[in-house]
């Protein structure tokens, strides 16, 4: 049976993501490159996905670009869509009962309300680096943990620690101060999460 292959590319400010679907249902290949718009990241992400799947660009029935740098792929993409709409559709694809999506990007944080794969409302924080992916990258580096482990570690917190600064530089100083006082990293991480959410 012949499959219909499609490619989705999300070009963010700090990362490039690509995914290939078969028949709009099955994830065939995916890639995440830690550099985004204006770099080789988007092309590398596409190349990785095509290589993983053993396919060529010409075998793709449709290519969609989204994200901060979506306009940079006009020659490759058949269409462009806002990342908000893509988040709603993608989250519903993975988790059909989803109602809330939180996107912590390199430049901003977006919280979406989703109903049946459609975004019905959203709020966004785009002031400096407060609460963004870059903020969390810096905090993870200072704490010497992987950014992907922050959620699990923060959930193990047993004591409330306040990180009051929303500025990345000042929050980094607060975290270093907490570490020097012997505060448990898990409690600091929980404080960071609460700071991002406020």
Regions found by a protein language model. Give the residues of each.
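Glycine-rich phosphate-binding loop plus the immediately following alpha-helix
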Residues: 38, 116-159
């Amino acid at each position: 049976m012949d499959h219909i292959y499609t490619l989705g590319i999300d070009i963010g400010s700090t990362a490039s993501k690509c995914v290939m679907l078969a028949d709009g249902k099955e994830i065939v290949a995916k890639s995440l490159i830690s550099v985004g718009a204006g770099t080789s990241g988007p092309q590398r992400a596409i190349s990785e996905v095509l290589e993983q799947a053993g396919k060529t660009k010409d075998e793709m029935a449709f290519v969609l670009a989204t994200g901060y740098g979506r306009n940079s792929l006009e020659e490759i993409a058949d269409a462009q869509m806002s990342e908000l709409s893509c988040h709603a559709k993608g989250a519903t694809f993975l988790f059909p009962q989803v109602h809330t999506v939180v996107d912590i990007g390199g430049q901003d944080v977006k919280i979406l309300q989703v109903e049946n794969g459609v975004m019905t409302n959203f709020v966004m924080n785009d002031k400096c680096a407060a609460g963004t992916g870059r903020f969390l990258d810096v905090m993870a580096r200072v704490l010497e943990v992987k950014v992907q482990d922050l959620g699990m570690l923060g959930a193990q917190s047993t004591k409330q620690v306040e990180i009051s600064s929303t500025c990345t530089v000042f929050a980094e100083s607060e975290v270093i101060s907490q570490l020097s006082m012997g505060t448990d990293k898990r409690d600091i991480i929980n404080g960071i999460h609460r700071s991002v959410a406020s």
